[in-house]
């Protein structure tokens, strides 16, 4: 069928991940080659999912001794409660247990209270332990209880407030996303002798709770899962499906020689120079591999794709146990059926 071209579109042949200055948090991810226009499509989709849909952990509420609401101040603490809340939002957390969980901070002045002063709990790790929460003057004594939970995206303080919240519990806006920054760039790239492909480069920075390349992988998996509902047909039969009538483990058409396809002289010579003898050899090549063949261009590629399509085949197919040991004998056996 003419519409069944998804397997013939060129796919990225390599994913290059270059760590940044902080490998646990920064990386540049490059994918190429992509069909023209796919760089922008994929880059934009991945960026949106990275920023909005990955699971992370955040502080969702705080309760400070002798404080009734967020517009208060704490004796001996330089920052007011509003500033303390803002600083708590900046605490990066890796959480490997089901939430919500309660943590606490107990400190006396003089000194600086940092994220490293948050109490430890199994399955919860504070990543930016030097992050400043507040400054205490001499004689100051502060105790606060924190609620930590998992989620995705942004959740307002109003939604984080429990119905049975005790007096003094202050809900906090939660920014769960472990991804802090994402930018992408699309540049033209060459594949063989063809120049009109895309190269997608993404710069990703996380809070350290997961690596940038894992973040991209999770985002891609989310997109894959969400798009599956739109596929309203079954996959075509594989070329390696057994043919019950002849006992072969593959389509006998794969035994036909490419010399019999009546290709143009240029295309035929390119296949010959690349030691492609049978259709079974040809269909296992990807578009990218074909375009790397010397003197093989887009015109030859389109010609071969059209011929294969007429046979119900396409480039990039997977054929198990190819080539068979007795391929020449099998080719002669089925020669009259082609």
Swiss-Prot record:
Q: Which reaction does it catalyse?
A: RNA(n) + a ribonucleoside 5'-triphosphate = RNA(n+1) + diphosphate
GO CC term (a single one): DNA-directed RNA polymerase complex
Q: Which domain of life is it from?
A: Bacteria
What GO biological process terms are annotated to this protein in UniProt? DNA-templated transcription
Alpha C-terminal domain (alpha-CTD): annotated span: 250-338
Which SUPFAM superfamilies does the annotation name? C-terminal domain of RNA polymerase alpha subunit (SSF47789), Insert subdomain of RNA polymerase alpha subunit (SSF56553), RBP11-like subunits of RNA polymerase (SSF55257)
What InterPro entries would the database entry show? Answer: DNA-dir_RNA_pol_insert, DNA-dir_RNA_pol_RpoA/D/Rpb3, DNA-dir_RpoA, RBP11-like, RNAP_asu_C, RNApol_insert_sf
Q: Which UniProt keywords apply?
A: DNA-directed RNA polymerase, Nucleotidyltransferase, Transcription, Transferase
> Under which EC number(s) is this enzyme classified?
2.7.7.6
- Return one GO MF term: DNA binding
Region Alpha N-terminal domain (alpha-NTD): start-end pairs:
1-234
Pfam families recorded = RNA_pol_A_bac, RNA_pol_A_CTD, RNA_pol_L
Q: Among its keywords, does the record have Transferase?
A: yes
Q: Which family, according to UniProt? A: Belongs to the RNA polymerase alpha chain family.
Question: HAMAP family, alphabetically?
Answer: RNApol_bact_RpoA
Record text on subunit structure and interactions = Homodimer. The RNAP catalytic core consists of 2 alpha, 1 beta, 1 beta' and 1 omega subunit. When a sigma factor is associated with the core the holoenzyme is formed, which can initiate transcription.
Share the domain note from the entry: The N-terminal domain is essential for RNAP assembly and basal transcription, whereas the C-terminal domain is involved in interaction with transcriptional regulators and with upstream promoter elements.
User: What's the stated role of this polypeptide?
Assistant: DNA-dependent RNA polymerase catalyzes the transcription of DNA into RNA using the four ribonucleoside triphosphates as substrates.
Q: What is this protein called?
A: DNA-directed RNA polymerase subunit alpha
Source organism per UniProt:
Roseobacter denitrificans (strain ATCC 33942 / OCh 114)
């Amino acid at each position: 069928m003419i519409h069944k071209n998804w397997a013939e579109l060129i796919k990225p042949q390599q994913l290059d991940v270059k760590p940044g200055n902080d490998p646990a948090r920064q990386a540049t991810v490059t994918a190429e080659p992509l069909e023209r226009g796919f760089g922008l499509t994929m880059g934009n989709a991945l960026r949106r999912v990275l920023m909005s849909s990955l699971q992370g952990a955040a502080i969702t509420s705080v309760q400070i001794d002798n404080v009734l609401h967020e517009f208060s101040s704490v004796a001996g603490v330089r920052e007011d409660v509003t500033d303390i809340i803002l600083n708590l939002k900046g605490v990066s957390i890796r959480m490997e247990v089901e939430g919500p969980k309660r943590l606490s901070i107990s400190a006396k002045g003089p000194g600086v209270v940092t994220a490293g002063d948050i109490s430890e709990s199994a399955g919860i790790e504070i990543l930016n332990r030097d992050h400043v929460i507040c400054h205490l003057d001499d004689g100051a004594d502060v105790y606060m209880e924190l609620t930590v939970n998992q989620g995705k995206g942004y959740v307002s303080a109003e939604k984080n407030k429990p119905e049975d919240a005790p007096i003094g519990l202050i809900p906090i806006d939660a920014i769960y996303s472990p991804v802090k920054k994402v930018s992408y760039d699309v540049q033209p790239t060459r594949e063989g002798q063809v120049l009109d492909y895309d190269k997608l480069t993404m710069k990703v920075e996380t809070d350290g709770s997961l690596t940038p390349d894992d973040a991209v992988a999770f985002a891609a998996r989310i997109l894959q899962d969400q798009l599956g509902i739109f596929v309203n047909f079954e996959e075509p039969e594989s070329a390696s499906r057994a043919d019950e009538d002849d006992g072969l483990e593959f389509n006998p058409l794969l035994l036909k020689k490419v010399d019999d396809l009546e290709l143009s002289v240029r295309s035929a010579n390119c296949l010959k120079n690349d030691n492609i003898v049978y259709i079974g050899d040809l269909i296992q090549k990807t578009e990218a591999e074909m375009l790397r063949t010397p003197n093989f261009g887009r015109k030859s590629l389109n010609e071969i794709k059209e011929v294969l399509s007429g046979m119900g085949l396409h480039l990039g197919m997977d054929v198990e146990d190819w080539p068979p040991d007795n391929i020449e004998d099998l080719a002669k056996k089925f020669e009259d059926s082609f």
